[in-house]
Amino acid sequence: MSREDTYTRTSRSVVQCIAHTRTGARCKRRTRRTNLCYAHLEKEQHLKIKKSTIPGAGMGLFTTVQRRAHRMVAPYTGEYVTRPQDNYGGDYVVSLNGPPQAPPYKYVDARKTTDGAGRFSNNARRQDRKTNNSHLSANSNSRDAKVVASRNIPAGSEILTKYGNDYWRRHD
């Protein structure tokens, strides 16, 4: 059975971790932030979610291992939608690049999902002495979005992602 088969996307509710233990049994831990419990998120993706170093930003995404430039840090997953209406996630909507003939889903809305750690990456804009170390990469043909390291990121660092001009036009 695949992870997709054993996991149902929900709206910020508590879900069972989708990972399996060393014995092959499904992990019994519950989580409300991603589809993996804290232990499996660290073990499988080498990530932690904890209080951000950005004042007022809430939770942030941190790497537990060094990340090399131009490599994926975390998937950016959520509900695939055709247009970013007000009832969609707003701050958590990522546009999937692609030609007009690409699949009908043009956006990933991570507001209501608990299946991806990428949504916890913050932006360092307007923060003294902090710079973004990653960016969002999206593709409508492959229907995926991900957080990618823009430069080498040391272990223990917060993943700070460039959100792009469209995001800041809505927030300035």
Model feature map: region roles:
Residues 1-9, 35-38, 45:
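Fe(II)/2-oxoglutarate
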Residues 2-12, 125-172:
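C-terminal SET catalytic tail plus cysteine-rich post-SET Zn-binding segment of SAM-dependent SET-domain
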Residues 44-130:
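Catalytic cores of histone-lysine modification enzymes
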